[in-house]
A protein has these predicted regions:
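A short, solvent-exposed beta-strand micro-motif common in secreted/extracellular proteins
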Residues: 44-57
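Extracellular beta-sheet/turn segments enriched in Thr/Pro/Gly and aliphatic residues
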Residues: 59-83
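Short beta-strand/loop motifs in extracellular/secreted proteins, especially
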Residues: 10-14, 47
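Short, acidic Ser/Thr/Gly-rich low-complexity loop/linker segments typical of extracellular
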Residues: 21-34
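Asparagine-centered strand-capping/turn motif at beta-strand->loop junctions
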Residues: 4-8
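Exposed aromatic-hydrophobic patches
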Residues: 33-41, 78-79
Length: 83
C-alpha cells in the first residue's frame, strides 16, 4: 500500500516507476491523506519501485521517493510538504 500525505495546496497525480515503466496510481487531493492499494502484477518487472507525485496545476514541484523494494503487506508513505 502507498500512503500519500499531501500537505501542499496542489492536487497531485501519483505514479509508481519500476524498470523504466511509469504506472499512474491515481489522484492525491491537496491537504488530504490518500491510500492506494497496489495489486500484485500492477507494476511491471521486478526490483525496486520509486513513487512520484506530480502537480496537476500551480507552482508545486514534483516529489519522488527513495527507491524501495515492496513486499506483500508493506506500506510506504510519501510525504508532500507544504509550499
Amino acid at each position: 500500500m502507498l500512503e500519500v500525505v499531501n500537505r501542499s495546496s496542489s492536487d497531485m497525480d501519483i505514479f509508481a516507476v519500476r524498470s523504466g515503466a511509469r504506472v499512474r496510481l491515481g489522484l492525491a487531493p491537496s491537504n488530504v491523506t490518500t491510500r492506494f492499494n497496489i495489486q500484485r502484477g500492477q507494476l511491471p518487472g521486478g526490483g525496486t519501485v520509486t513513487f512520484q507525485a506530480r502537480p496537476l496545476l500551480g507552482l508545486a514541484r514534483a516529489i519522488s521517493s527513495e527507491p524501495t523494494i515492496l513486499s506483500p503487506g508493506d506500506t510506504v508513505t510519501l510525504q508532500i510538504p507544504p509550499p
